[in-house]
Amino acid sequence: MTLLSLHRTLARKFRNTRVLRSGLTLTVIMAACLQGGCRTEQPWPLWDNYVKSAIDGQGRVIDHSAGDRTTSEGQAYAMFFALVANDRSHFDSLLSWTETNLAGGDLTLRLPAWSWGKAPDGSWKVLDPNPAADSDLWIAYDLLEAGRLWRDPRFEKLGNVLATRIAQQEVVLVPGLGTTLLSGAVGFHPDDSTWILNPSYLPPFILAHLAKVQPTGPWATVLDSLDPMLSDGSAGGFAMDWVTAGNSGIRPGLSPMQRTAINKLDAPFQGKLDTTPIGSYDAIRVYLWLGLADPATPGLHNLLSRVNGMAAYLKDHVTPPQIVDSAGRIVDTNAPPGFSAAVVPYLTAVGLKTQARVQMDRLSATRDASSGLYGKNGSYYDQNLALFATGWSEQRFRFDKEGKLNPKWE
């Protein structure tokens, strides 16, 4: 905003007050505005409706479809949306709740626990102290960009500390792959030759931004690991939820929970779908992140080509698949509306604008008039995917090639 346009804005805003009678007062106000103090919250109906339905007065994001639990993912995404909306009050409350309840009161000392909710004894507390690396990345990114955009050094410093801890505790060197992001600090390295990875945990724009902010860190090489993870760990051009990497190569894999289930099953049941690699609720975010990234993001063209199966499928089908198996076969076509939202930026990025409009139309057709949310139940995950996709489609935010956030209000 130029000084002239700022002066005109203030003149309109305060035309009926005495403030403009004092040139000194106006100068003070202008200075404050240039420091971010007069930027107003941007109207965003979907964000407002999501806040009403899922965020309590303390800043806790509640997943009503999962026993009212809270995850670090939900907190991280909501902090991002609050930043896009220039909603400082909700950002502050979300951060405060996260630090108090998921990080033992101090994010400088530990990574946040991923799951919080009602325990079997009826108490509300951390259910699993293990951190989730993708949520940790998002929170670090949110803090770094909030510090820059709102000119708050505390946020930037906290984001840097968090990113450094992620590099120490959740970044690993995997034979045959290189330096990459482990999905969590515990439970994802079951033996000396196996690492369990999740491609959707590596948004290219976040890694590109961390590489810029912390040039001596591992982030550029972590971003480089996404290409082989997708090229060797996908199936028929479809991203998988989980990838196994290590001495035996890179291939579609199982989550820790699936591996545990297999160990408990008798042999005749081990071919069941829930114990085989699939692409579904995690993998859908791979398409979303690639679509949101700036076209000039390092390596993006190759990354998009690794998951071209989704683009090919949607040339001839109205909705994305809900489940794809490890051979690239479509198992379930009943994708929720959030899946349609997630592929809109991706389809746009690969030049399929007509197909992108079809997915946006499908999403819009599922909007509930009373709640303003998408889908019959207004599910947590659908709303988050929709907030990312519609926020981008409505040009409320963009990422540049180095991952810097450019919100509409800036």
Q: Whereabouts are the PLM-identified features?
A:
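Bacterial N-terminal signal peptides
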Residues: 23-33
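N-terminal secretory signal peptides that target proteins for export/translocation
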Residues: 1-18
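C-terminal functional modules
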Residues: 329-410
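Aromatic-rich carbohydrate-recognition surfaces in CAZymes
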Residues: 71-75, 126-148
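Low-complexity, Ser/Thr/Pro/Gly-enriched N-terminal "stalk/linker" regions
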Residues: 38-73, 83-126, 175-184, 213, ...
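Extended ligand-binding clefts on enzyme/binding-domain cores
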Residues: 42-45, 68-72, 130-134, 156-341, ...
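Second-shell loop/turn segments in exported
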Residues: 65-68, 80-84, 126-129, 149-151, ...
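Short glycine/serine- and small hydrophobic-enriched flexible loop segments
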Residues: 79-84, 138-148, 205-209, 288-292, ...
